[in-house]
């Protein structure tokens, strides 16, 4: 709709338009607000919305112009999906006018456009003033420049940048980023977290702009929320809602029957559905985050299986490989669900294979916080300790960033109600399947449950501490012959077990039913469900408003009389002998010794985008303290693949200064220092080939020299290389001794190892292997075959330049269709890279000869090693498409399927 201008008016450009109502006392007149530009001058045009449009008023946008959003009176309570907002407008010589815009999102967009226009107008008139006194400031994250590879070859790559050695394949972003927590730094890519239902409840105008005229509105709002939470009992009522929770391992099958016997088995439709699947897709591609058609198949099957008596809407979906979690709610309850966030954690080998791990969703329903976790833990009877570790890893690594809020990330346990479902894979400590089946036939389930590993581990407080589980009155849900009710009749003859479980923690949770559903026979597992009555905190608006106003009055009075103050127990921290992938913690306390509540946060230093270096993390990094309240803060140092290279090369040190900022108060400075022990992990192949001794025995100055020498100079004359031993001049090793030691061990001892490169190693053993390679040239490698295999993968992933150099990445993709060209490309690699590639291919071809024993397939090996050997350059990582990945896999298959002569 274009505004109609008076006759003789100069042409203008209509930039933005929004319809609303002008408030004149009790009257509401329809109108249209238009942001326009004429001859370089921005204007706000107010038009009547009658039968004939005409200009009622034109207000110049200049330094005296004001257009602000009004704060609402009902604050921080239930979120409506689109509540509208009110604005005030005043020009140079015009009275203040009030408008109501029904569509909140359009209103906020219009306000931002007007603000941008006003800023643009002011910049035309007044030079920009820079505040030199603001020494510390929070800056937006900027994309760091992409560095070209370290290594080159021949004359085609003379323009390479050989100076930068930082492994930037996963650069951290944002000041709220979490450094990779131990034991693994895997984080699911945004594509895998993408929700199918994008119509989320909106955050209201009020929650974003609590006190519009106040320059510190965000800080004040946070404090108010903090105190409101403390006084929650004064304004909430407990109301019961019905939650249906279901879990099913579908063994890679597609739905072949209705899910109503599982999802629609109660006379009264539940208010909320939480449905978890495991082994949704068992294809190799799915293991490495490719799209899965099974996701859509099962999501549609769930929707068709929901009760027809009620209307449901999908709240969110999250998937990691074969684990999928869906949450549905009755349509009339969706408006009370807000602050939705999802997260995934893979506990498979290196996090590359997300076949095990967990997916989770958190949300606020009315005023109660929920976290729903769907997990698939490690398999095999004897691996109960690995299952315990998987559970701990998920708890430690899974944290949620709440959308549209600047609050710290919240972990699983920081919710009012946690529901944990899935194929937890805990078995029975009874080896005789016939004895177990006999007890089942006699319905002596309680005798069997005494041997249930999950019950034993919970009793010993080694896993799922503080969780509850309902009484199990159904027979084991694993393992059956698919499409039948018969126990496993295969050669393995699995012992029946209650693998599929539902647990919970929190108050006001009452389980009504806990059952299996034998009618569904698609999989070798049977689905399980639980029905809960959960007491939810519902806000009483009248009492809420009274508490809110009381808090505001108290804060107004105290803010005028007192300034915040903190006391720190320590300000200097020393981290000694920091190692790759080995966590170190130092703790200290901060106390609010002032008279008012305060908000603290670690903030970036000048010109920084993060409050600390990538290898450091403060937990929590921000929060609120009431007078006389004390909190423990942990400073964690963890060197991951993203920071190991620059620490190895001496470009970075274990040194940092943290700025702890107190709102309305002063800044406190924390000094971080320490020493780092270099590792062969994260060191370039060229440097390692020239080291005849373990890296810890090489002087630091020599390490720096080795990393700074360019490959082009080394290729010109091998005899002119900097020797490690004084007075000698030796050719480099054909391949790094570390790679040879790992591969040789696997070749000798692991060719028959079941599920090699598919089962993660133990973290303690991985650390022993890393230390062993850094400090010695061992005759044997410590640890299990699985740990040695994962150590090899970690080594390849940590290389600053992959085995196939970044410069050849695109050429490899382009030549994937022609084996002859593929071999030509490999011949152009630098010598040590070429040798390593051929050595690894020879080993993998040998490994594939024993696939009947080790369950290693060509496609699985190609997919796994492609992600390590043929990585896209950092600047192309985010733009890599499924087609690119498939071509990269095809390139590697040329060598895996080729002859030994290749």
Swiss-Prot record:
Gene3D superfamilies, from UniProt? 2.30.29.110, Endonuclease/exonuclease/phosphatase, Immunoglobulins, Rho GTPase activation protein
Region annotated ASH sits at 565-679
CDD domains in alphabetical order: INPP5c_INPP5B, PH_OCRL1, RhoGAP_OCRL1
Q: What is this protein called?
A: Inositol polyphosphate 5-phosphatase OCRL
Q: What is known of its domains?
A: The ASH (ASPM-SPD2-Hydin) and RhoGAP (Rho GTPase activating) domains form a single folding module. The ASH domain has an immunoglobulin-like fold, the Rho-GAP domain lacks the catalytic arginine and is catalytically inactive. The ASH-RhoGAP module regulates the majority of the protein-protein interactions currently described. The ASH domain mediates association with membrane-targeting Rab GTPases. The Rho-GAP domain interacts with the endocytic adapter APPL1, which is then displaced by PHETA1 and PHETA2 as endosomes mature.
PROSITE patterns attached to this UniProt entry: RHOGAP
Listed A to Z, the keywords are: Cell projection, Cilium, Cilium biogenesis/degradation, Coated pit, Cytoplasmic vesicle, Endosome, Golgi apparatus, Hydrolase, Lipid metabolism, Membrane
Residues of the site described as Arginine finger = 758
Record localization: Cytoplasmic vesicle, Phagosome membrane; Early endosome membrane; Membrane, Clathrin-coated pit; Cell projection, Cilium, Photoreceptor outer segment
**Name of the encoding gene:** Ocrl
Q: Which GO terms of type biological process are on file?
A: cilium assembly; in utero embryonic development; phosphatidylinositol dephosphorylation; signal transduction
Q: How does it assemble?
A: Interacts with APPL1, PHETA1/SES1 and PHETA2/SES2; APPL1-binding and PHETA1-binding are mutually exclusive. Interacts with clathrin heavy chain. Interacts with several Rab GTPases (in their GTP-bound forms), at least RAB1B, RAB5A, RAB6A, RAB8A, RAB31 and RAB35; these interactions may play a dual role in targeting OCRL to the specific membranes and stimulating the phosphatase activity. Interaction with RAB8A modulates OCRL recruitment to cilia. Interacts with INPP5F.
Which EC main class describes this enzyme? hydrolase
Rho-GAP domain segment(s): 722-902
């Amino acid at each position: 709709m274009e505004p109609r201008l008076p006759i003789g008016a100069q042409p203008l450009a209509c930039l933005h338009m929004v319809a609303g109502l002008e408030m004149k006392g009790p009257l509401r007149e329809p109108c249209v607000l238009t942001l326009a530009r004429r001859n370089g001058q921005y204007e706000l045009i107010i038009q009547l919305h009658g039968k004939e449009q005409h200009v009622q008023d034109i207000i110049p946008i200049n330094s005296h112009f004001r257009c602000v959003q009004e704060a609402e009176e009902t604050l921080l309570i239930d979120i409506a999906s689109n509540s509208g907002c009110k604005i005030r407008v005043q020009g140079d010589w015009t009275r203040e006018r009030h408008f109501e815009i029904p569509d909140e999102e359009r209103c906020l967009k219009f306000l931002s456009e007007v603000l941008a226009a006003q800023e643009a107008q002011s910049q035309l008139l007044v030079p920009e003033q820079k505040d030199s006194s603001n020494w510390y400031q929070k800056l937006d994250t900027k994309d760091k420049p992409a560095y070209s590879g370290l290594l080159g070859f021949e004359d085609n790559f003379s323009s390479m940048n050989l100076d930068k050695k930082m492994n930037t394949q996963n650069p951290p972003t944002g000041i709220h980023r979490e450094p990779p927590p131990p034991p693994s730094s895997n984080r699911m890519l945004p594509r895998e977290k993408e929700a199918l239902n994008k119509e989320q409840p909106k955050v209201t105008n009020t929650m974003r702009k609590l006190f519009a005229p106040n320059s510190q509105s965000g800080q004040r709002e946070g404090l108010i929320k903090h105190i409101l939470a403390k006084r929650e009992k004064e304004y909430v009522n407990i109301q019961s809602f019905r939650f249906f929770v279901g879990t099913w391992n579908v063994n890679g099958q597609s739905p072949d029957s209705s899910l109503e016997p599982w999802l629609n088995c109660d006379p009264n439709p539940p208010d909320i559905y939480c449905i978890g699947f495991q082994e949704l897709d068992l294809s190799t591609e799915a293991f490495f985050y490719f799209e899965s058609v099974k996701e859509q198949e099962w999501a549609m099957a769930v929707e068709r299986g929901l009760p027809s008596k009620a209307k449901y809407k999908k709240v969110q979906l999250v998937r990691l490989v074969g684990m999928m979690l869906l949450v549905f709610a009755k349509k009339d309850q969706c408006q009370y669900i807000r602050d939705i966030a999802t997260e995934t954690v893979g506990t498979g080998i290196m996090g590359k294979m997300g076949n095990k791990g967990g997916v989770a969703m958190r949300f606020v329903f009315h005023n109660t916080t929920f976290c729903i976790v769907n997990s698939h833990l490690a398999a095999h009877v004897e691996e109960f300790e690995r299952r315990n570790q998987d559970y701990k890893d998920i708890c430690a690594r899974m944290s949620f960033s709440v959308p549209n809020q600047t609050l710290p990330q919240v972990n699983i346990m920081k919710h009012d109600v946690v529901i944990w479902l899935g194929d937890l894979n805990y078995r029975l400590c009874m080896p005789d399947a016939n004895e177990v089946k006999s007890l089942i036939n006699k319905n002596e389930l309680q005798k069997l449950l005494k041997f249930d590993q999950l019950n034993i581990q919970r009793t010993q407080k080694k896993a799922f501490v503080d969780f509850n589980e309902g009484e199990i009155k159904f027979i084991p849900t694993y393992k059956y012959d698919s499409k039948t009710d018969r126990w496993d009749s295969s050669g393995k003859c699995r012992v029946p077990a209650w693998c599929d479980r539902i647990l919970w923690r929190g108050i006001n949770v009452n389980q009504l039913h806990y059952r299996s559903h034998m009618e569904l026979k698609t999989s070798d597992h049977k689905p399980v469900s639980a029905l809960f009555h959960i007491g939810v905190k519902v806000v009483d608006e009248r009492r809420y408003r009274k508490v809110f106003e009381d808090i505001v009055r108290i804060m107004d009075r105290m803010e005028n009389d007192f300034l915040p103050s903190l006391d720190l127990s320590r300000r200097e921290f020393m981290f000694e002998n920091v190692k790759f992938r080995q966590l170190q913690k130092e703790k200290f306390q901060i106390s609010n010794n002032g008279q008012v509540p305060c908000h603290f946060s670690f903030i970036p230093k000048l010109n920084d985008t993060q409050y600390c270096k990538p290898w450091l993390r403060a937990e929590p990094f921000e929060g609120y303290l009431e007078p006389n309240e004390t909190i423990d803060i942990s400073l964690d140092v963890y060197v991951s693949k993203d920071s190991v290279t620059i620490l190895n090369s001496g470009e970075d040190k274990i040194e940092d200064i943290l700025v702890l900022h107190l709102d309305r108060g002063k800044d406190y400075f924390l000094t971080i220092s320490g020493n780092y022990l270099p590792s062969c992990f994260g060191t370039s192949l060229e440097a390692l080939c020239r080291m005849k001794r373990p890296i810890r025995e090489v002087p630091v100055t020599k390490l720096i020299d080795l990393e700074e020498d360019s490959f082009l100079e080394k290729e010109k004359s091998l005899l002119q290389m900097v020797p490690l031993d004084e007075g000698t001049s030796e050719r480099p090793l054909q391949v790094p001794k570390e790679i040879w030691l790992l591969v040789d061990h696997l070749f000798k001892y692991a060719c028959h190892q079941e599920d090699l490169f598919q089962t993660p190693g133990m973290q303690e053993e991985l650390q022993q292997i890393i230390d062993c390679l850094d400090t010695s040239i061992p005759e044997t490698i410590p640890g299990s075959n699985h740990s040695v295999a994962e150590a090899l993968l970690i080594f390849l992933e940590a290389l600053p330049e992959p085995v196939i150099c970044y410069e050849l990445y695109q050429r490899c993709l382009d030549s994937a269709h022609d084996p002859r060209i593929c071999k030509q490309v490999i011949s152009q690699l630098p010598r040590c890279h070429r040798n390593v590639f051929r050595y690894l291919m020879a080993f993998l071809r040998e490994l594939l000869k024993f696939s009947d024993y080790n369950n290693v397939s060509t496609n699985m090996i190609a997919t796994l090693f492609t992600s390590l050997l043929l990585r896209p350059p950092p600047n192309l990582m985010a733009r890599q498409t499924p087609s690119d990945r498939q071509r990269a896999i095809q390139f590697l298959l040329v060598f895996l399927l080729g002859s030994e002569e290749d």
